[in-house]
């Protein structure tokens, strides 16, 4: 019953999203030119496209509006499928998702060595970032200027930080009443309020690039 409730709520989030399909399909690091800033994002469970339909494209669009012609947005996909079942794995997501995110950070560093990397995740996507970033070598970690995490499913488990990554480069958004931030997979209405934090997240990232 709990899993059915989670699925119903998450499906409703996607259906209600105002973000159009074109903006969800951001694959610009892989197929586009290098830009001054590269944004890598892992979407929430059941969200479609590369960036999802909420905070991912919200932050991407905010960065692009502030730094016109200087931002490439890249979603962690397609091997990260954002399925519900992977939330229950020990790392909070699949190894395939983690490996894909690691490869994207490596691609940004090798293809675009002068880019400034910023990153983010929402819900299960935060677990992707919590696991991928610590796996990177120090030279790539140093290229990451800021990370924003919404509804962090690894917040309690990792002590309110990304392991082995500077806390001053990380901003975690955990709404009052969002129980996933407290080490559970219980989904409440608070888990769907993070569009309200997008503008602040954009400002946080811009201040670091």
UniProtKB/Swiss-Prot annotation:
Cysteine-cysteine disulfides: 34-112, 60-73, 174-181
Query: What residues does the record give for site: Transition state stabilizer?
Result: 45, 124
Q: Which UniProt keywords apply?
A: Disulfide bond, Hydrolase, Secreted, Serine esterase, Signal
Citing just one GO molecular function, the answer is:
cutinase activity
Q: Which residues form the active site?
A: 123 (nucleophile), 178, 191 (proton donor/acceptor)
Q: Which SUPFAM superfamilies match?
A: alpha/beta-Hydrolases (SSF53474)
Which reactions are catalysed by this chain? cutin + H2O = cutin monomers
Q: Which domain of life is it from?
A: Eukaryota
Give a Gene Ontology cellular component term annotated to this protein: extracellular region
Q: Which InterPro entries match?
A: AB_hydrolase_fold, Cutinase/axe, CUTINASE_1, CUTINASE_2, Cutinase_monf
One Gene Ontology term of the biological-process aspect is: carbohydrate catabolic process
Under SMART domains, the record lists: Cutinase
Give the EC number.
3.1.1.74
Q: Provide the leader sequence positions.
A: 1-16
List localization entries. Secreted
Q: What does the sequence similarity comment in the record state about its family?
A: Belongs to the cutinase family.
> Its biological function?
Catalyzes the hydrolysis of complex carboxylic polyesters found in the cell wall of plants. Degrades cutin, a macromolecule that forms the structure of the plant cuticle.
Q: What is this protein called?
A: Probable cutinase 1
């Amino acid at each position: 019953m709990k899993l059915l409730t989670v699925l119903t709520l998450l499906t409703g989030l996607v259906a209600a999203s105002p973000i159009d399909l074109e903006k969800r399909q951001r694959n610009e690091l892989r197929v586009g030119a290098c830009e001054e800033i590269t944004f890598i994002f892992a979407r929430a469970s059941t969200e479609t496209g590369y960036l999802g339909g909420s905070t991912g494209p919200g932050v991407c669009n905010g960065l692009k509006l502030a730094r016109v012609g200087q931002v490439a947005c890249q979603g962690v996909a397609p091997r990260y499928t954002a399925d519900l079942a992977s939330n229950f794995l020990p790392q909070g997501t699949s190894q395939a998702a983690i490996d894909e995110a690691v490869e994207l950070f490596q691609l940004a560093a090798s293809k675009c060595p002068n880019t400034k990397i910023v990153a983010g995740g929402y819900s299960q996507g935060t677990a992707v970032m919590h696991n991928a970033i610590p796996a990177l070598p120090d030279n790539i970690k140093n290229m990451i200027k800021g990370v924003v995490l919404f509804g962090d499913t690894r917040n309690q488990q990792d002590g309110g930080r990304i392991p082995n990554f500077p806390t001053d480069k990380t901003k975690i958004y955990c709404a009052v009443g969002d129980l996933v931030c407290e080490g559970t997979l219980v989904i409440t209405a608070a888990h769907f309020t993070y569009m309200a934090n997008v503008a602040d997240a954009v400002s946080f990232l811009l201040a670091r690039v």
